[in-house]
Regions:
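Short glycine-rich, Thr/Ser-proximal phosphate-binding strand/loop in the N-terminal lobe
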Residues: 3-45, 58-59
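Short beta-strand-loop/turn "lid" adjacent to the catalytic site in phosphate-handling enzymes
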Residues: 52-93
């Protein structure tokens, strides 16, 4: 199994964690992400400027994003923003 990225996000902060086989390899905290308060472009900018630079050397295979405001109508906003910065095959937003 390869590395996965898990994000637990509220409106004020996001906890990011790279894991492999149940072991935490790297973790950090960033700004909050909420599609209720931010556009896809704003979320993309946040990920590109503050998340991607910390993850660019990790071979991430999947992203699992758990966030406030990720109602069914808004999950595509977050999924698209993640994909623009971290183009992995599996991106799940809850």
């Amino acid at each position: 199994m390869k590395e996965i990225l898990i994000a637990d996000s509220g409106a004020t902060k996001t906890d990011w964690c790279v894991a492999k086989n149940g072991e935490i390899l790297f973790r950090f905290t960033g700004k909050g992400i909420s599609p209720v308060y931010q556009s896809e472009d704003e979320i993309t900018e946040e990920i590109q400027k503050n998340v991607y630079p910390l993850l660019k050397n990790w071979p991430i295979d999947a992203v699992y994003f758990y966030g406030s405001g990720c109602i069914p109508e808004k999950t595509a906003v977050v999924r698209n923003a993640i994909y623009q910065s971290l183009p992995v095959e599996t991106i799940e937003v809850y």
